[in-house]
Amino acid sequence: LQRTIENFAVCKNDFFGYFKDDTLAGIIEIKHHTSYTHVQSLVVLPFFFRQGIASQLMSFVFMHYRKKPFFVETGVKNKPAINLYKKMGFVEVKQWDTDYGIRKIRLNKS
């Protein structure tokens, strides 16, 4: 995934960060629609893995955006992300292959 600063500057999505001390340790990107909320991306710096940051960002989103359902997509090989989403109440709804040969999974939370 390659995105430029210009892409972020014109993006209409919402971004929330998680700071640990003075370091931006994680960030979540949300696209909020009138009928659902889409988790566009969730990234945690590797140094901060396994510290609950992704879970805290997801919990914040659930409290801040009350419009359900929520949905998220990731690669089927991204087992840590899939496990996190399932722990947070998401269930798998479909899998498909992208034009780039990547197998993806979509999970929803009602």
What are these regions (language model features)?
Residues 40, 45, 49, 73-75:
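Residue-level recognition of the GNAT/N-acetyltransferase active site
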Residues 8-11, 30, 57-68:
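Alpha-helix C-terminal capping segments
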Residues 31-40, 49, 68, 99-101:
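A conserved beta-turn-beta hairpin within the catalytic core of GNAT-like acetyltransferases
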Residues 44, 50-63, 83-87:
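Conserved acetyl-CoA-binding loop-helix of GNAT-fold acetyltransferases
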Residues 17, 23-31, 36-43:
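Conserved beta-strand in the GNAT
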Residues 1-15, 19:
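Active-site rim helix/loop that mediates acceptor-substrate recognition in acyltransferases
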Residues 18, 37, 80-92:
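Conserved N-terminal glycine/acidic-rich loop preference
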Residues 71-79, 87-88, 94-110:
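C-terminal "cap" of GNAT-fold acetyltransferases
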